Every structure is written in C-alpha cells, then in structure tokens.
C-alpha cells in the first residue's frame, strides 16, 4: 500500500449517471465531493449543464461548483490548483477526496501536471482575434503549423480559443507551446505536486457508462429534451440579456449553450437547435470515451447495473484504497 493518501476519480461520459453513484458512495464512505466539470464552475448556468439541484448540493456539497461568473474564463491550470487545495483540505480531515465529472482534460491536468505557459497578453490576443476575423481561422492554423506543427496537428482548425492561445504563446515568448511543454516535463520529472509534477495521491480510477452506446444516445436525447422543458432556452435568454456575455466566451461555447444561443440569434430553427444540441452532446461523449480508452487502470461500471455501489466497494477493497 502506498504511503500517499487515497483519492477516487469517478469519470465517464455525459448522462452516464456519475453524480448518482458519487452520492451513494458518500453515504457509505468517508468521502467529500469535488466536481470535475468545466460547465458546472459557472454560476447561473444550471439547466444546460445538468447541475445538481440546490437540494442535492445542500445535502451533498460539491466543491468547485458555482465558483466563476460566466464572463470569466477558467483554465485547466486553475482547476488543478483549486482541486489540489480542496483535496489537501479533505485529506487533512481524514476523509477521501471523491472527484466526479466528465472533463477529462481536468483529470489529466491533475495526474500529469501542466506546463507553465506565458501569461495572456491582451494586445497580442486582440491582434490575433482581428486576424481571425479578417483572414479566417484557416490562416491562423496555417501560421501555427509553421511555428508549432505538433500543436497544429493537435488543435482543430475551427477551434479559435486554442488556435489563438497557441499563437499567443509563440508571439509573447518566441517559443512554441510544444517547446514549453517539453521543457517543463523534463524539469518536472521527479517533482511532486508542483505545476508540472505528479499527483501526490494513490488514485482509484472508476468510469461509468452504459455498455450499449445506443442506450447512452437515448439518454442524451432524453436529457436534452428535459432541459428544454425545464427552461433551458429561458436560462440562455437571461444570459444574453447581460451586456458582458457573448458567443465567444468559454462559458457560452459549452455544449448546448452555444446551440441555444444560435437559436436565439435566429441562426437555427427550434428543431435544428434541438438536433444540433443532441449531436454536439453525443460528440462530447465520444471524445470522453476516447480519453477513457487511453486511461491507465480504469475500472468500468455499467450504468444500467443495479449493484454498482457494491461493485465499487468491492473494487476499492481489492486494491486496498480504503486501508
């Protein structure tokens, strides 16, 4: 048994039932919950993010929910710092951090650390945004391929946020994002919990999903329809009423929100909005599965099984995470 304190990751695609299982675990284990979800960090974005209800959050508090205004950004590096702080506080009380959510980049940031990148430069960013508007994202992607082919291969040509950030890093520092990461990795080998170090916990990685992908697709479609019935469009309408929010913000680009925003902009019909929202959520689930297939030592659970709690406890006992 490792001398490191234990932590549990409960991962899985959207609409798989992660929150329900996490709450069941807190009833039988000395765990406290930490949300790992890039949409749940935002206040006022409740319906479209499938945020647990106020009643559930009151009975089963989750850290890192409602910690940012939608006008603000929230990076993987910020998540790592916040999560490490929360995990340390939970561990100090003799309890186990139970991290639950589907933002796989956040989990990776915790496990592998992140390279220290140059701070954002407003002037450089404004110049790049102007270029994107005037010349198109394809031109920015071409520029990135010239100075950082590794990042260009990794970043989709239609991803303005990451394209601009990668070019910004190069223009501010004169060094590519790939070079920064490679140097940071070399310097951080053997480190513990620093920005590039490894996570100082013994982690049990769990993932929950239906074994039949068709069932997950049905659940995604049903949940999106339920969100619309619960007032998702009105929620986005309220966000649009704020003068400081726009479609380019990370919060508004969240799956579902950008489709409803486009609908309210008149770019989509109601049926198109519904269809594209469901498709985008399916694509998110596919990306989450891709991450999870490469995740080391993950223990899978079937969303439809009636004994997931006992299966989880048996697994945790078998790997001595609870010793």
UniProtKB/Swiss-Prot annotation:
EC numbers: 2.5.1.75
Which is a GO BP term held by this UniProt record?
tRNA modification
Residues recorded as binding substrate, renumbered to this chain, are: 14-19
Q: Where is this site: Interaction with substrate tRNA?
A: 103, 125
InterPro entries with a match to the protein in the record = Dimethylallyltransferase, IPT, P-loop_NTPase
Annotated region (Interaction with substrate tRNA), positions in chain: 37-40, 161-165
A GO molecular function term, named singly, is: tRNA dimethylallyltransferase activity
Reaction it catalyzes: adenosine(37) in tRNA + dimethylallyl diphosphate = N(6)-dimethylallyladenosine(37) in tRNA + diphosphate
Cofactor or coenzyme needed: Mg(2+)
Q: Which UniProt keywords apply?
A: ATP-binding, Magnesium, Nucleotide-binding, Transferase, tRNA processing
- The answer to keyword Magnesium applying to this record is yes
- Its family? Belongs to the IPP transferase family.
Quote the PANTHER family the UniProt record gives: TRNA DIMETHYLALLYLTRANSFERASE (PTHR11088:SF60)
Summarize the protein's role: Catalyzes the transfer of a dimethylallyl group onto the adenine at position 37 in tRNAs that read codons beginning with uridine, leading to the formation of N6-(dimethylallyl)adenosine (i(6)A).
Question: Which proteins does it associate with, and in what oligomeric form?
Answer: Monomer.
Annotated protein name in UniProt: tRNA dimethylallyltransferase
């Amino acid at each position: 048994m490792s001398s490191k304190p234990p932590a549990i990751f409960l991962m899985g695609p959207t609409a798989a039932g992660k929150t329900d299982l996490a709450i069941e675990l807190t009833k039988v284990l000395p765990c406290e919950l930490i949300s790992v979800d890039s949409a749940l960090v935002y206040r006022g974005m409740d319906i479209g993010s499938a945020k647990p209800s106020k009643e559930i959050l009151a009975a089963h508090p989750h850290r890192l929910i409602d910690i940012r205004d939608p006008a603000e950004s929230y990076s993987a590096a910020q998540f790592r710092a916040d999560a490490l702080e929360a995990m340390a506080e939970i561990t100090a009380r003799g309890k186990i951090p139970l991290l639950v959510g589907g933002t796989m980049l956040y989990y990776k940031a915790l496990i592998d650390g992140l390279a220290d990148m140059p701070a954002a430069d407003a002037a450089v960013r404004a110049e790049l945004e102007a270029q994107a508007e005037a010349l198109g994202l394809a031109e920015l992607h071409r520029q990135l391929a010239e100075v950082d082919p590794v990042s260009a291969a990794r970043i989709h040509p239609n991803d303005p946020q990451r394209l601009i950030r990668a070019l910004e890093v190069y223009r501010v520092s004169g060094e590519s994002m790939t070079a920064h990461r490679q140097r940071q990795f070399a310097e951080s080998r053997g480190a513990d919990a620093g920005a590039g170090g490894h996570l100082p916990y013994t982690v049990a990685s769990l993932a929950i999903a239906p074994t039949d992908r068709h069932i997950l697709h049905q659940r995604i479609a049903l949940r999106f329809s339920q969100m619309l019935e619960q007032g998702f469009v009105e929620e986005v309408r309220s966000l649009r009423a704020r003068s400081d929010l726009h479609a380019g913000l990370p919060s508004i680009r969240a799956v579902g929100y950008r489709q409803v925003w486009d609908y309210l902009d008149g770019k989509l019909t109601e049926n198109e909005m519904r269809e594209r929202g469901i498709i985008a959520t399916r694509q998110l689930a596919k990306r989450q599965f891709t991450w999870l297939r490469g995740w080391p030592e993950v223990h899978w659970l079937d969303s439809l099984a009636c004994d997931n709690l006992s299966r989880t406890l048996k697994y945790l006992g078998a790997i001595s995470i609870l010793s």
